Amino acid sequence: MPYPANYGGVIDVFYKLKALHSLGIEIYFHVFEYGRGEQKELNKYCKEVFYYPRNSFIKSFLSVDPFIVKTRANDDLIKNINKYDFPILFEGLHTTIPIQLEKLNGQKTYVRAHNIEHNFYKGLAKSESNVFKRNFFKQEAEKLKRYEKILLNVDGVFTISPNEQKYFRKKYGVKCKYIPAFHDTEIHTNLEVKGNFILYHGNVSVSENVKAALFLIDTYKDSIYQLVIASSYVNDQLAIEIVKHKNIRFHSLQGEDDLNRLFENAHINVLPTFQNTGIKLKLLNTLYQGKFVIANDFMIDDTGLESLCEKANTKEEFLTKTKELLDKTFDPKIVETRKKILHNFSPIESAKKIIDIILTRDRHLK
């Protein structure tokens, strides 16, 4: 479910819908709903929206297919897709089971590769302290590595970062095309207000983000700085740590506008990650909507966005950069610099590339 678009994993999907719609593309959107509810906002950009439940978790654990794939096997999905002879864009490897089951009617098929999935799950296993979850992530990584060969059977793969383009191009050939991540391009930053706290936002149901949040708690817990950790999900482990420190609080995100208000009032956005996978959508989103950004190597290396961020890797470096930036006001010139560099990540230009590739496939994939 890509709305509200308030964490990295759904930002690319939602703003891709908006961009394609703005260019006149009719979209029949198929979405698995598990907790976020049906969203009327999607009707603004889609001709029709179909909702499906995920399958039994217990049965899916026992499958030779990856859990994230097997839980999305759905007969109604295949029936609805086969009503039309339109090209199909699968959002992530995990949505591709209709291809694996060989139940499509010959439609052109394309996959948006959000990550090198088996590497992503290996990283989750390394970040996970729970033994059961760690073993699950390891097994899922192995299954995903085997399952990835399904990309041999699709007409095109749209990669999300230059590094991952190299990987997919080497394995699956010229049908792999780099399409920069989709994101919100509206500048929300209120330049007249100097922010008064430090913000970290992310989906803390994901162990990688929990690890990043714990790192930040440990970094700022004995400082004079106010840290806000924002997520639409409440993590018990983080809640226990946060309550110990008066200068750190949790903000439960209620919607996209809620996150925008935090961006407007935060002076610094801190974005550490411990996985060098894909491009972090939260980085792009923050550069458009937030003020200063401090990020580590894993977050910004080889993104083309290095010059727009302050780099810090250790706790000491984060604290030093924080002190420096809190003494500065956010100059409007910074926004203009960002706009120039972020033009390379224009959602409209990326949407045009997708349309061009799909509509003139033979010319582009030779």
Where are these regions (language model features)?
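N-terminal subdomain of nucleotide-sugar transferases
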Residues: 1-49, 84, 220-221
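Conserved catalytic-core segment of nucleotide-activated headgroup transferases in glycan assembly
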Residues: 12, 178-242, 249-264
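Membrane-proximal helix-turn-helix segments that form the acceptor-binding/catalytic region
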Residues: 15, 75-82, 116-120, 128-157
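A charged, aromatic-enriched C-terminal amphipathic alpha-helix characteristic of glycosyltransferases
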Residues: 72, 329-366
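Active-site proximal beta-strand in glycosyltransferases
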Residues: 87-88, 104-127
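Donor nucleotide-sugar binding/catalytic pocket of nucleotide-sugar-dependent glycosyltransferases
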Residues: 138-188
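Acidic donor-binding loop of glycosyltransferase active sites
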Residues: 263-278, 289-291
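Short hydrophobic beta-strand element within catalytic cores of glycosyltransferases
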Residues: 282-288, 292-296
